Amino acid sequence: MSPALWAMACGFVLRVSSMPMGVFCRMTTVRRADLSCVVQAGGLSSRMGCDKARMPFCGEPLIERVLERLALVGSELVVTTSRPGELAYLEDREFDGLVPRVVMDIDGPAGAMRGIASSLTAARLPLVAIVACDMPFVSPELVGALADRVKEGPLDVCVPREERGIEPLCAVWRRESCAPAACELLASDRQRIRCLIDRVHAGYLDEPQIIAAAGSLLCFENVNTPEEFAAAELLA
């Protein structure tokens, strides 16, 4: 292993917790009948140099790894993308009994709000988990805890919040209230996800609750460069 890769892998670990790797993602959860899980794959992957959604991660396309994890907690799988033809093959695949739908991003200015609005309008179930395609350690247990918090609140969105800030691309939203608000913000080209969070009834899961559900903070790590991708594979 090169010194650079070793340093990157150590950096991943230092950013999460000192817990054993075996509990980073526990992978035991209950499927929620009212939860759609939407994976966003509309980015340009400019820092990666190629489409990271389809890059092999430990032998399988990264997006398939994410879908496999989310299938444990959701009752619908959706992929939103600006290039549906490249991911159409996913509609011939099955993940824990669920076949994903691949949906084109809605029209509007490019940016984060377009992704959120596309995800919320594509989903068919009342609650919507929106997750980026480049999060190889996404925790189904955490997604389930977020969904439960939205229902119990009741809230319009529950967002993980840790020392580095909020994690809006691993949050659960209430479709009925959040989809119209997201589309309205998109129409006025207000791209910051914080604008949507501030407009609706939001709640948060803080770091102790996140770790109780997911085992650590590794679930938020994403891979944007070849070096980060290789380092993440060492931890998988």
Please place each PLM-identified region on the residue numbering.
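Low-acidity, Ser/Thr- and Arg-rich intrinsically disordered low-complexity segments
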Residues: 2, 6-18, 25-26
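Low-complexity, intrinsically disordered regions enriched in charged/polar residues
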Residues: 4-6, 97, 223
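Hydrophobic alpha-helical membrane context
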Residues: 12-13, 20, 146, 186
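Short, basic/aromatic-enriched C-terminal tail that caps enzymatic domains
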Residues: 219-236
